[in-house]
């Protein structure tokens, strides 16, 4: 089954979700991530994923346009902006939306920022495990 995970920048939430689902259920799902306005993979996302043994340091931010015309079984949007600007996919594609906070928007110390990234990572992992179990 093919899964595309979308957020705005393809810099944190969707990158972490791609790494998590690929790590936890990559034998079942072919996983991709993209953004409606791609930027760069956040170093904090790389750090907190490394803490749970998942390396996303080789990931790059991709535009959803790179996947135009491709078929996916599921498109999961993990931010409200991506849901609103999500391109049209074939009718057979199941769309799922999770409104996940943007950890990069958290103001405060570096430690507080990493705490926000960890919280988002853990929320994504819980949601993705439930998704994978059907």
Annotated model-derived regions:
Residues 1-66:
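Conserved active-site segments centered on acidic
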Residues 11, 80-83:
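Short glycine-rich anion-binding loops that position phosphate/pyrophosphate groups of nucleotides
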Residues 35, 79, 99-101:
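Residues at the C-termini of beta-strands that transition into short coil/loop
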Residues 39-41, 82-85:
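Short, charged/polar "capping" segments at the starts of alpha-helices
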Residues 69-71:
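Alpha-helix C-terminal capping/helix-to-coil transition sites in glycosyltransferase folds
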Residues 83-134:
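Phosphate-binding/catalytic loops
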């Amino acid at each position: 089954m093919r899964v595309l995970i979308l957020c705005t920048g393809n810099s944190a939430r969707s990158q972490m979700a791609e790494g998590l689902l690929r790590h936890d259920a990559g034998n079942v799902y072919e996983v991709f991530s993209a953004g409606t306005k791609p930027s760069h993979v956040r170093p904090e996302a790389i750090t907190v994923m490394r803490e749970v043994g998942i390396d996303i340091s080789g990931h790059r931010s991709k535009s959803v346009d790179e996947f135009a015309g491709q078929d996916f079984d599921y498109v999961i949007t993990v931010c409200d902006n991506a849901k609103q600007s999500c391109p049209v996919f074939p009718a057979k594609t199941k769309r799922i939306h999770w409104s996940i906070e943007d950890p990069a928007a958290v103001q405060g110390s570096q430690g507080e920022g990493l705490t926000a990234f960890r919280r988002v990572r853990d929320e994504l992992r819980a949601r993705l495990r439930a998704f994978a179990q059907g």
